[in-house]
């Protein structure tokens, strides 16, 4: 058997073993099925500069590799989240209601089922209409942080 052929067989066996062992590694994330209406909502927030009063969060999970949280956020009717940015990308799904978002200077209206990608460092603010709360499902690609932008 020539050396090239033997090297290929050894390489293929090693790749096969590596792939098999990767497939057998358990995920550090636990399975979850969640009815967001039954989530463990935290108390309404108090007044803090830039943050809407009365927002409620329900933590769902934190990615053990990136530190990125997944959580529910309920913004009260008529609330506003001042212009800010985050280090990491944030993805959001509107679960209930309607929200207006200014994202890097462009105005958008998002309704139930809409998907929003907010790239890291993109300036954005949220405004909730006066008639109803909005519920969002959000996930960050890294630890949560907030940097407010001066008007």
Label each PLM-derived region with a short phrase.
Residues 22-67, 151:
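A short, N-terminal "cap"/entry segment at the start of jelly-roll beta-barrel domains
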Residues 27, 32-33, 127-151:
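Double-stranded beta-helix
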Residues 66-86, 119-120:
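Conserved short histidine dyad/triad with adjacent acidic residue
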Residues 104-121:
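Short acidic-glycine-tyrosine-enriched beta hairpin
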């Amino acid at each position: 058997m020539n050396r090239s052929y033997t090297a290929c067989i050894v390489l293929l066996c090693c790749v096969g073993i590596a792939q098999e062992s990767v497939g057998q590694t358990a995920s550090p994330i636990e399975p979850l099925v969640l009815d967001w209406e039954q989530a463990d909502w935290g108390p309404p927030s108090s007044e803090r500069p830039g943050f809407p009063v009365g927002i409620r969060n329900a933590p769902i999970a934190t990615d053990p590799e990136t530190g990125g949280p997944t959580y529910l956020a309920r913004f009260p009717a008529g609330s506003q989240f001042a212009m800010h940015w985050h280090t990491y990308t944030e993805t959001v799904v509107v679960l209930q209601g309607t929200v207006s978002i200014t994202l890097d200077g462009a105005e958008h209206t998002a309704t139930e089922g809409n998907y929003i990608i907010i790239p890291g460092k993109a300036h954005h603010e949220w405004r909730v209409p006066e008639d109803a709360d909005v519920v969002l499902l959000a996930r960050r690609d890294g630890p949560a942080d907030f940097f407010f932008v001066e008007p």
